[in-house]
Amino acid sequence: MGFRLITQLKGMSVLLVLFPTLLLVMLTGAQRACPKNCRCDGKIVYCESHAFADIPENISGGSQGLSLRFNSIQKLKSNQFAGLNQLIWLYLDHNYISSVDEDAFQGIRRLKELILSSNKITYLHNKTFHPVPNLRNLDLSYNKLQTLQSEQFKGLRKLIILHLRSNSLKTVPIRVFQDCRNLDFLDLGYNRLRSLSRNAFAGLLKLKELHLEHNQFSKINFAHFPRLFNLRSIYLQWNRIRSVSQGLTWTWSSLHTLDLSGNDIQAIEPGTFKCLPNLQKLNLDSNKLTNVSQETVNAWISLISITLSGNMWECSRSICPLFYWLKNFKGNKESTMICAGPKHIQGEKVSDAVETYNICSDVQVVNTERSHLAPQTPQKPPFFPKPTIFKSDAIPATLEAVSPSPGFQIPGTDHEYEHVSFHKIIAGSVALFLSVAMILLVIYVSWKRYPASMKQLQQHSLMKRRRKKARESERQMNSPLQEYYVDYKPTNSETMDISVNGSGPCTYTISGSRECEMPHHVKPLPYYSYDQPVIGYCQAHQPLHINKAYEAVSIEQDDSPSLELGRDHSFIATIARSAAPAIYLERITN
């Protein structure tokens, strides 16, 4: 009985172990199921470019990323993604979505990134994005949205990036971004916005970059951007802006970049830039500006880059404040400013026209202090030219005046430049002294620590110089000496001297060196026929033998007809050899 009970318990234990294992395997297999025509990479599902008209089935509930880009989805139904509660990002761009149900995003509360760009969405319900309060990135660009609901983005307190580019928006509702307190980037470019309400951007305390380019604004008042303390860049290019004004009662110290290019700005109100003390980059090209006032350029105290080309500059006395400001400006600037008037200087560069026609010759420059100090920021450059004020001839003589000239400098800045130069000289001298001291210290330590090595180096250098000198002397000794040659032209008298006396003068010459005379002893008895030279000169290393023996005849044969006394004895023999120290003569007998 006990044995059977033990056996049954063992069987049950095996089943209890196997059943959960099989169940776990089945659940795992179900979770890893990948829809047809899709690609699954772990917890990421890619169902792209397969003309899906609806959301594919069998998508794992544990998926964290789903891409449905480049398909044919036309509508997002209610609870469309309810089973994907682990989803973190969802890409639905480049479809044909025109309708989005109010509850389409129910059940995916953890969603952080939603891309709906490049669709045909014309309307979004007020509560469309309420089920996804954790969104960080929302892209609605390149759709056909005409309006935004007043509570369109309510509850999106964690939203950082919002794209509304290339829609058909005409207005921005008041306080529509009130809850987007962490928004960092907002793009409203390429819409049909004509105006902005005073509180359109209320609540965007952390906004850093705002795009409003390619809209239909006709005027801009900085009062429309209330207390955007962290805004660094605002882009307003290619609108229809005719005037720029400011109604701020506070200093907008955070703004560094302002792009107003491609508008219809004809004039800038004096004092417009006083509220922007830290403005560093300003684009005013492709407008209709004719001049810039002295008060305006005085407010450009922190600029490091400016573009002014493509305007209708009037090259008269009104251009002088801007001309002198640009002349002293040390940052990046556009140099292609062209005169639009008067007619006789149209098409000429502003700088050339002013200097050629002495337009500003009677304008006096007075150095003034800044009316206010800009708050210090990390991005502010350490030094910029001080603004100047231009006066007419009516300025009292008590003021210090400087007439414009090519070498014009602002008074009061020389000391600053001298101070900087003096410090640079001191720093350079100290650096040079320390470098020399370090080199000498290294040499001294090496000499003290390794004296034998230093001596060896010196001896090695000395031996090397000696070897070099020895090689040079050897090269000089072994250089090829000049060739020897013998030019022997015996006359009849010399021949007779040799025949009778047994000796005669013989001269050989070392070209370019010296001459010597050596006697050649010949026995008087034999006679020689001069088919070959009588003597051989200048042997080098080996004796030079006359190849043919001399033909000697006895005195008894003196009357023989074979003796030809009329032979020509002016035969010339020249022998050339390499130089050799030993030279001797040898006669070969028959």
From Swiss-Prot:
MF annotations from Gene Ontology: heparan sulfate proteoglycan binding
Q: What is its main location?
A: membrane
- Superkingdom as given in the UniProt entry: Eukaryota
Q: Which residues are glycosylated?
A: 58, 126, 291
Q: Does the keyword Nucleus apply?
A: no
- Free-text tissue specificity from the UniProt record: Expressed in the brain (at protein level).
Where is it found, in Gene Ontology cellular component terms?
AMPA glutamate receptor complex; extracellular matrix; extracellular space; GABA-ergic synapse; glutamatergic synapse; photoreceptor ribbon synapse; postsynaptic density membrane; postsynaptic membrane
Query: Which segment of the chain is annotated as a signal peptide?
Result: 1-30
Query: Which stretches are LRR repeats?
Result: 60-83, 84-107, 108-131, 132-155, 157-179, 180-203, 205-227, 228-251, 252-275, 276-299
Entry membrane topology = Single-pass type I membrane protein
Give residue ranges for domain LRRCT.
Answer: 311-362
- Transmembrane ranges, per UniProt, are 425-445
Which Pfam families did the record assign? LRR_8
The alphabetical list of record keywords is: Cell membrane, Glycoprotein, Leucine-rich repeat, Membrane, Postsynaptic cell membrane, Repeat, Signal, Synapse, Transmembrane, Transmembrane helix
Gene Ontology annotations of biological process type? AMPA glutamate receptor clustering; neurotransmitter-gated ion channel clustering; positive regulation of synapse assembly; regulation of presynaptic membrane organization; regulation of synapse assembly; synapse organization
Task: Give the UniProt subcellular location, in the record's own words.
Answer: Cell membrane; Postsynaptic cell membrane
PANTHER family, per the entry: AGAP008170-PA, LEUCINE-RICH REPEAT TRANSMEMBRANE NEURONAL PROTEIN 2
Q: Which family does it belong to?
A: Belongs to the LRRTM family.
The annotated subunit structure for this chain is:
Peripherally associated with AMPAR complex. AMPAR complex consists of an inner core made of 4 pore-forming GluA/GRIA proteins (GRIA1, GRIA2, GRIA3 and GRIA4) and 4 major auxiliary subunits arranged in a twofold symmetry. One of the two pairs of distinct binding sites is occupied either by CNIH2, CNIH3 or CACNG2, CACNG3. The other harbors CACNG2, CACNG3, CACNG4, CACNG8 or GSG1L. This inner core of AMPAR complex is complemented by outer core constituents binding directly to the GluA/GRIA proteins at sites distinct from the interaction sites of the inner core constituents.
Q: What name does UniProt use for this protein?
A: Leucine-rich repeat transmembrane neuronal protein 4
Organism, by scientific name, is: Rattus norvegicus (Rat)
Which gene is the coding source of this polypeptide chain?
Lrrtm4
